[in-house]
Amino acid sequence: MENTVTQCGLDVALAVVGGKWKPLILYHVRGGPTRFSEVKRRVGGISEKVLVQQLREMVAMNVLVRRDHNRVPPVVDYALTPFGETLVEALVPLCTWGNRNRAEVTEMLQREGGQEV
């Protein structure tokens, strides 16, 4: 039997927000209820299929709430839950770090493989 020891809370946080898209989605819904089409436009580069999957996962994890306004045409928006708000608060320092180090990271990534930030 394998004994798994949690080294820190980072593995727990990454289980909720891990991956390329979830932190960006959270960043773009932090200002209040946001319609699906607006999330897709703000995030940029994400397919509709992947966005639907990521939103469903975050709703299932109680990070976001999905609200269907039962109108025609359909109006659905997503908002942070109180639990999700605490997660966004935890991501703010990471965002600050990224802004502060953008030039250096961009230079390193371009030097290594031509990737842009």
Give residue ranges: language-model regions:
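Basic amphipathic alpha-helical segments that dock to polyanions
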Residues: 51, 55-58
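Beta-hairpin "wing" of winged helix-turn-helix
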Residues: 59-79
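Amphipathic alpha-helical dimerization/coiled-coil segments
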Residues: 27, 86-117
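Short amphipathic alpha-helical/adjacent loop interface patches that line ligand
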Residues: 33, 43, 55, 84, ...
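Short, contiguous, well-ordered secondary-structure segments
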Residues: 3-4, 13, 62-63, 90
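N-terminal helix-turn-helix DNA-binding core of bacterial DNA-binding proteins
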Residues: 4-50, 71, 77, 85, ...
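Loop-helix junctions at membrane interfaces
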Residues: 2, 80, 116-117
